[in-house]
């Protein structure tokens, strides 16, 4: 990340990032990151990203991309193959030449060459361009944030609790910590992308390949294992159905006293499947009265606080009153900062 930022600042380049989609190499809130002051580019350089005018792509990734005839993206191994804004160059530029070199290892050479060719006139032009990009990006950032807040405010006091409120109330509690969002966020609304700042390579570890179930808790506990020795905390916004595949990792987190906060997105269903079944019932004219069979978790409801307690983990819930959410999150963050894992069971909106 340091070298990518250095190159961008040396050239005053407008940049984009995949920070809200998974591990990345450019901070989301950097002044040069965003739409910029102009969409007209002389040159588009991709660093381990396909389809720029010239992309520096490692041999292993390049081989995967060349073999990806079905455009499946290798379950997230090859970033940007089919994701909007990443599969093509900036300004939707057409694909260009791929140079098979390691991007990170090549950056010092590029930086050295930029410095060699730098003149005072070029430096003044770069400073002017960078300033214009920074102003435009700040304006775009504020507009996007205000729009997101307006949209999410609509369900602020809803019961069951809106997933946006979980992310919104959690952010002030962790924003000054060295945090990792270790769990996928797509099924819980992906609100981190709009409300949080992703400025480190590990800010968000991304999603599970192919939407696979049972990934969230084990992946988050694994991240917490690495985070412990680094003084970091891991955040796990945990889907309820997903946890039931491998709940034993809660014992692992407790046994090793891992710094992980698990907040249950407990909609009492495998809601992706429930919505699909209800949709198909409508398409086939069968009625939706039996759509819950095999897709919901009721009769009985699962008490995840008690589940965590069985594995020795502290926790609380189920929380149904949104007014009580903030205090619970505060207790959870405090516990994790002491090195003790914590689980908060929150009864949530479906998505």
Descriptions of predicted regions:
Residues 1-16:
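Redox- and metal-dependent alpha/beta enzyme cores, enriched for Fe-S-associated oxidoreductases
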